[in-house]
A protein has these predicted regions:
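Catalytic-loop motifs flanking and including active-site residues across diverse enzymes
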Residues: 40, 127, 154-157
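Polybasic low-complexity intrinsically disordered regions
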Residues: 1-86, 160, 175-178
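C-terminal domain-tail junction helix/linker
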Residues: 151-178
Length: 178
């Protein structure tokens, strides 16, 4: 299973993850790179409502379009919040060089572009990115070596089990040391 995503210039596979607020993987699906985020999100959430009954709200990035969000709300009954940069839909304005720029418009433009193209911490978006960063510590998940996508999914679940177990051991050891 392999594909090519022209927008991201990625050849191979994409990992679609459903994580909780702490970044622990609930479900993972590996699909070809030519599958869009919305299609991958639908594959990820197929037959999931009975498994995670307490799940009510999803935080997603801008790759998931309005039609996907409506599909989730209608099919699963969950609310969806698209987490984006504050300047995600602002591209700037065009103004002719030979005319002076009005000061009142300049002040309004400065308010809109505050943080434009600078690093901005986006709440909730970093949770999934942190989970992907955890995978880079495991050589097997750093690249896609496996022939079958199910093998990669199994290694992701194994890695998350190991990380969770390590956290539990640290929680048990800490009270004893005090």
């Amino acid at each position: 299973v392999s594909g090519y995503d022209c927008a991201k210039k990625v050849k191979g596979r994409k990992r679609h993850l459903l994580v909780d607020t702490q970044g622990l993987v609930l479900k993972v699906v590996i699909l070809p790179a030519n599958i869009t985020d919305a299609e991958g999100g639908q594959k990820l959430l197929e037959n999931i409502k009975d498994t995670f009954t307490r799940l009510k709200h999803l935080f997603v990035d801008g790759g998931y379009k309005r039609t996907w969000c409506e599909w989730v709300e209608q099919t699963l009954g969950w609310s969806v919040e698209v987490v984006q940069r504050p300047d995600a839909n602002f591209r700037g304005i065009w103004w002719p060089n030979d005319k002076p720029f009005p000061p009142e418009l300049e002040q309004e433009l400065l308010k809109k572009t505050k943080g434009f193209r600078d690093f901005v911490v986006i709440p909730r978006r970093w949770v999934v990115e942190r989970t992907f960063a955890w995978f880079t510590f495991y050589r097997r998940l750093n690249r896609d070596y496996d022939l079958l996508p199910e093998t990669t999914e199994a290694f992701i679940y194994t890695t998350m089990s190991r990380l969770t177990l390590r956290r539990l051991v640290e929680m048990v050891r800490e009270p004893r040391q005090k």
